[in-house]
Amino acid sequence: MKVRSSVKQICDKCRVIRRKGRVMIICVTPKHKQRQG
């Protein structure tokens, strides 16, 4: 899980979701998991 101020989709499988007011990227590639913070 990478914590970044700006989250971007890295590949086609990356999806942007909002959880508890936080913007997150979920993907089939674990390396692509990101959270805004």
Swiss-Prot record:
PROSITE patterns xrefs: RIBOSOMAL_L36 (PS00828)
Any one GO molecular function term: structural constituent of ribosome
Repeat as UniProt keyword: no
Keyword Ribonucleoprotein found: yes
GO BP terms: translation
InterPro entries named in the record: Ribosomal_bL36 (IPR000473), Ribosomal_bL36_sp (IPR035977)
GO cellular component: a single term: cytoplasm
Source domain of life: Bacteria
Record key words, sorted: Ribonucleoprotein, Ribosomal protein
NCBIfam families in the record: rpmJ_bact (TIGR01022)
Similarity-based family: Belongs to the bacterial ribosomal protein bL36 family.
PANTHER family: 50S RIBOSOMAL PROTEIN L36, CHLOROPLASTIC, LARGE RIBOSOMAL SUBUNIT PROTEIN BL36C
Name of the molecule in the record: Large ribosomal subunit protein bL36
Organism whose genome encodes this protein: Mycoplasma capricolum subsp. capricolum (strain California kid / ATCC 27343 / NCTC 10154)
Phylogenetic classification of the source organism: Bacteria, Bacillati, Mycoplasmatota, Mollicutes, Mycoplasmataceae
Gene name for this UniProt entry: rpmJ
